[in-house]
Amino acid sequence: MTKAYNIIHHKFDVVVVGAGGAGLRSAFGMAKEGLNTACITKIFPTRSHTVAAQGGISAALGNMGEDDWRWHMYDTVKGSDWLGDQDAIEYMCKNAPDAILELEHYGVPFSRTVDGKIYQRPFGGMTTEYGKGKAAQRTCAAADRTGHAILHTLYQQSLKHKVQFFIEYFAIDLLMEDGECRGVVAWNLDDGSLHCFRAHNVVLATGGYGRAYFSATSAHTCTGDGGGMVIRAGLPLQDMEFVQFHPTGIYSAGCLITEGARGEGGYLVNANGERFMERYAPAAKDLASRDVVSRAMTIEIREGRGVGEHKDHVFLHLNHLSPEILHRRLPGISETAKIFAGVDVTKDPIPVLPTVHYNMGGIPTNYQGQVIIKDGKNHNSIVNGIMAIGEAACVSVHGANRLGSNSLLDLVVFGRSSALKAAELIKPASPHKPLQKETLEKIINRFDKVRYANGNILVADLRLKMQRTMQSHVSVFRTQKLLDEGVGMISEIRNRYKDIKINDKSLIWNSDLVEALELDNLLDQALVTVCSAAARKESRGAHAREDYPDRNDRDWIKHTLSSIDDSGKVVLDYKPVTLTTLTDAISAIPPVKRVY
């Protein structure tokens, strides 16, 4: 089959797949360390989804009041509902201030205080004094376009350090032999050629799989391509049942309104004009963690206190803030609300609804980015030749629920740590192990089979069935009945993938084929998500079970590992959460009842 395709071979020290914040920070970090580095991306780097991150990036700088990285760690552990690994959380929070200063030195145009310091705003779940003090102003912001500012800066650094980019290349599958990764195969959308990239290390920075749902803040490119490749390689994914619903997606459009809007003083109201969050989170109110706010909004709507003709959303008020503050600190969402909701935020409230936003689960890694698996009694056995970072990975610093502004921090901290580890492991220009012909042949055969699929179902129709099923059956609130139905429905939809029809057989800019390959990735991750959720019989973080409303620390402080066997059956396993810290700089944080 390989003879039927124009295959171009490359050899690099490292290949990064994905050019968002994590991928770019990793790529130029590796190039800076002297490694011959390639970066494969299916879209132009500055169109990666990091560009849509609005509110900011967290670090205990203390510019707007006293702060400490230990308080940041406490908030992150609590936010994770004690499913986050405390060694990785310590590493992230301790390294956060240096990561911000590094970004500033690279040229990120952060907003400033009157005395020239980096401006920091309050964000949900961020406190002082280990949760006993006032709200922390910890989120460093570049107005409400922080991701845009960071992504462009990291791309400039990547060009400076001569990362070799392969832009508009679609990653098809990993080259796996003897339980280790030897490279990746990609398809050049512009000329139709296939490329075999040999590498001592492949770094997956491919983002989340938000597009498995019908309504999501994610770009249409967020199809979890890294997770799909990992599942097909026979490796597990971790904690896939934990899907974050952001409280404030614009009603009907799904576009994000940053949590920074509430950080600047915005508040939610129901049909009675009541600030209902005061009932659900008396201390934090509208700045409780995202899972808490999304559940509160859903309850208000269910109980008939929603707004609008169908009483199916709530209002976010910013119109009490001065136009000068809105213009200076929230210019992007003012524009977004005007375009997608027809609202002038200086005069009227924004209609909002909880919307799928982030995947806490992903490819299991350690805090140095290395992919790990459970091997007998060793729960953290390293898979050679492969790393994962960013939303594609599950380190796990976010556990069952991510705090807002910890995601951009995750990207730059673990992007950097993966680069340092790769430099430690790889000698530049060292020879590659030989690759068996069958390894490449297997990947080409799968690609060819999808390309020439001539069944009866259009990719768009099957994708819509998956998205609607996930939206209705694996949502903010869950029950065994709904989840079991969801398992059956997603399994059936996945089985029907073999009956898809590809009308366009060409290799140049074939969007039909791209979407078919993306759907394959989405379906596998949708299936392990719903199966993992059906098995976890407790409520923790973003996984809220109406039939199991309480957190069960005795049985469920453990990570879910999910894989798909050759017969298409989901296999679930579990491993302990790391409840010990990395160093003696802070004591472990024991589980307590999580209230805001």
From Swiss-Prot:
Q: Tell me which InterPro entries the record gives.
A: FAD-dep_OxRdtase_2_FAD-bd (IPR003953), FAD/NAD-bd_sf (IPR036188), FRD_SDH_FAD_BS (IPR003952), Fum_R/Succ_DH_flav-like_C_sf (IPR037099), Fum_Rdtase/Succ_DH_flav-like_C (IPR015939), SdhA/FrdA/AprA (IPR030664), Succ_DH/fumarate_Rdtase_cat_sf (IPR027477), Succ_DH_flav_su_fwd (IPR011281)
The molecular function GO annotations come to:
electron transfer activity; flavin adenine dinucleotide binding; succinate dehydrogenase (quinone) activity
Q: State where the protein is found.
A: Cell inner membrane
Q: Which controlled-vocabulary keywords does the entry list?
A: Cell inner membrane, Cell membrane, Electron transport, FAD, Flavoprotein, Membrane, Oxidoreductase, Transport, Tricarboxylic acid cycle
Could you mention a single GO BP entry for this protein?
electron transport chain
Which Gene3D superfamilies does this one have? FAD/NAD(P)-binding domain, Fumarate reductase/succinate dehydrogenase flavoprotein-like, C-terminal domain, succinate dehydrogenase protein domain, Succinate dehydrogenase/fumarate reductase flavoprotein, catalytic domain
Source domain of life is Bacteria
Listed EC numbers: 1.3.5.1
Give the protein's recorded name: Succinate dehydrogenase flavoprotein subunit
Organism equals Rickettsia prowazekii (strain Madrid E)
What broad taxonomic lineage does this protein's source fall under? Bacteria, Pseudomonadati, Pseudomonadota, Alphaproteobacteria, Rickettsiales
